[in-house]
UniProtKB/Swiss-Prot annotation:
Keyword annotations of the record: Hydrolase
Catalytic activity: GTP + H2O = 7,8-dihydroneopterin 3'-triphosphate + formate + H(+)
The protein, known as: GTP cyclohydrolase FolE2
Function: Converts GTP to 7,8-dihydroneopterin triphosphate.
Documented EC number(s): 3.5.4.16
Pathway: Cofactor biosynthesis; 7,8-dihydroneopterin triphosphate biosynthesis; 7,8-dihydroneopterin triphosphate from GTP: step 1/1
Organism listed in the record: Psychromonas ingrahamii (strain DSM 17664 / CCUG 51855 / 37)
Top-level lineage group: Bacteria
Site (May be catalytically important): 151
Biological processes per GO annotation: tetrahydrofolate biosynthetic process
Class of enzymatic activity (EC top level): hydrolase
Amino acid sequence: MPDIANSAQAQTEGKLDRVGMSNIELPLMVQTDDCPPQQVSANAEVFVNLGDAQAKGIHMSRLYLQLDELSTESELNISTLTALLQGFITSHHELSQRAFVKFSFDYHLRRKSLISEKRGWKAYPVIIIGRLSEGNFEVELQVNVPYSSTCPCSAALARQLIQQAFSQKYDQQTEVNKEEIFAWLGSTKGIVATPHSQRSIVEVKVKLNSLNQSFPIIELIDLIEKTLKTPVQAAVKREDEQEFALLNGQNLMFCEDAARHLQHSLHQETKFDDFWLRVNHYESLHAHDAVAMTTKGIEGGYLA
């Protein structure tokens, strides 16, 4: 059978940075932290460079079959990711010196409620990227984590309105009954305004170093949620909702606050050579989003 990729010469010569496939759907067993592998439904991209300016093209089936072997006979961890990239280059030894792979999937975690001890599933979007170039291996991990953000400015304005309502209610009284105030504060006439809040999402990308023996997906998610303190919940009873309201009231934040809190936490981590983050507050007051971005700020590192 004719093999055009091997036998034909390019009509127009030139080297290409990446050639391969995207939007490959496949199941994967993913090894994270110290947990048993979890099956995920992934979307993959695989590429090698075309370093021979005269070659017609690469051998895409060689990349696909190696990816399929990983899916059916192994699990995705740092070791197999390295081997996969090396296999891409070896199978194209006459054409390529660099390889790239990207996996996108949702990673499911059981999350406990704040007070009631109930549990539910949460799905976190995850991206794993591997690069191999002339023996230099790099791996990136990205997670997206939803949380709630309550506007500090709106909270201050709401408090002012409550103060004004209190003054109007009791301004003419020289003595105020404690029980009456207690009941008034628990009524809609007492709490006349509430601050606006919204579901928000932070995207965090880190470059892993040799201290990582596996993908620290859960560790990174836990770090983000612990830092922000208001993660979106799964199973919720009334006592959990009340605790969530308390956490939001005690952790008011602009997008700048969220970005700085995470920046500080990520700077303390030794497993990450670099980091990049983007905070997205999907405003309930405005028709636009409030966004803050930052990086570790190292030379030659990520750019915002």
